[in-house]
Regions:
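Hydrophobic, well-ordered secondary-structure elements that form the walls
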Residues: 29, 112, 119, 139-141, ...
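C-terminal polymerase-core module
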Residues: 49-101, 144, 148-190
Length: 190
């Protein structure tokens, strides 16, 4: 969508990607990335031309939710939206955006919970007791481990996190990738 690779363009691409997931309007996008309404509309149109499946997903999700009053994440967990058919445009619009977003955010949260459970079990066995899971921030997990064990523990973390959705109940055609950084403290990891 945006040809060059400057930091400003990276920010714009991220704003468009996340904005669409959250149901951003052309006016909201224009304000966020500091372009005209017309340019924002062109970005959104180009995005949906390049990724028509996303628009299909959004429309299908809203249609399903209007009929059923709920949506499911990839694990089947339901989120209810009782006001999705409200006569008030603002209420209805908010519910539509939330219904589109709930399966995405809910699925991501569930994947993280499953990864944390698996890692907690794996790291609590006798030979991994020196490693502690300290913190979760969105889609990141922070661990503390002795330097001499970092390589071995890194492999365990990558293996467990990337395979969290490979089971009898859940199998996805798109692999989960895991980026892992090591450092002396949290500030050096980014």
């Amino acid at each position: 969508l945006l040809g060059s690779r400057g930091l400003g363009d990276v920010y714009k691409r991220q704003a468009i990607n996340f904005g669409i997931i959250y149901g951003i309007s052309q006016y909201g996008l224009a304000k966020q990335i500091n372009v005209t309404n017309h340019e924002a509309e062109e970005f959104l149109n180009a995005y949906f031309l390049k990724f028509p499946e996303i628009k299909i997903y959004m429309d299908r999700t809203i249609k399903f939710c209007r009929k059923s009053g709920f949506v499911n994440n990839i694990f089947g967990r339901r989120s209810h939206f009782i006001n999705i058919n409200d006569k008030n445009y603002n209420i209805r619009n908010f519910q539509e955006r939330a219904a589109i977003n709930a399966p995405i955010q809910g699925s991501a949260a569930e994947i993280m919970r499953l990864a944390m459970i698996r890692l907690d079990k794996k790291l609590s066995d006798q030979k991994n007791q020196n490693t502690k899971m300290l913190l979760q921030i969105h889609d990141e997990l922070i661990f503390e481990t002795p330097k001499e064990e970092a390589k071995r523990i890194s492999k365990i973390i990558i293996d467990e996190m990337s395979s969290v959705v490979k089971s009898e109940q859940h199998s996805f055609s798109i692999p989960l990738t895991v980026d892992l950084n090591t450092g002396e403290n949290w500030g050096t990891l980014h």
